[in-house]
Amino acid sequence: MAVFDGQYKKVLEEIYYGGYKYQDPNREGVERIEISMINLYCRPSVGFPALTTKEIYFKGAIAELIFFMSGSTDIRKLWEMGVRFWDKDWANFHKYSDAAMNNLYEGWKSKKKEYISKDTSSVYSMGRIYSHQWRNANGVDQLYNLVSSMIKTPMSTSLIVNSWNPADLPKMCLPPCHYSFQILCQPVGDTYKFNLVWSQRSTDFFLGTPVNIMFYAALAQVLEIMTGYKCDMVIGELKNVHIYDNQINVAKELMSRDPELHGESKLEIDKSKFKLFLENPSALNFNSVINLLSLQDFSLVGYNSYPKLKVEMLSYNKKQKS
């Protein structure tokens, strides 16, 4: 049995049977079923929280983590990893029509001269999203500072990375949903273990949460390698926890599936990529290590699941231009 599946199914049932309904303020004509808040957790030592009652988008979670850690805000970095679930929000940010969005993607994909002969970085910018805040929040590298502080002062109560920068919200293609995470260390003999707690203001439970928990469980494992400490728990403090009306049928199908049919999986990361930082944990070496990471360095081992459940991901409704 994959432990996370039973927990996930229980919350999904709570939303479906006990949630309140209302019109989504950000998506015209869309209704939500919602509960105010819940906590989710997993223990990485037991297994990686990859949902088995539907096939999960593992590549998407890892690509997003690599992207955020790199500090890039260029959507082409995600495209290079085969990930496109940020496309609609990026297009809305620039007020591109669907046709304009697809033309830019196809132009990049085919490497036409007009797309590579000049600096087009602003065209492909996603604004000051998570990755910018993590690595360059008003000139501060929050992610490196977190890792450095974990190593030097693990009992600090300020081991926090915050993506919610009010001054930058209008400059983001999407305000951060999971807006901060904190590391809580405790001594174990002559070393330490830690919990990673992330906070989320708005939670698409069907599509978003399975990716979010894999994202943070993978981040916790990266932190384990960099610090030498073991992660005890990954905990999500989730608010405005909802499913959309277009997800109801697939949610019902998932709830009908047996969460005990498949066993646990585990995440394996190529530790050799971190050698330079482990020898000398400087900011320069941190950047070098992060920039070396690729999808091929992360492997999900022993994963089996029910078939995929397809549903459209809804983006914000905004007026667009061609």
Identify the function of each model-found stretch.
Residues M1-S322:
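Terminal, non-catalytic protein-protein interaction segments that mediate quaternary/complex assembly
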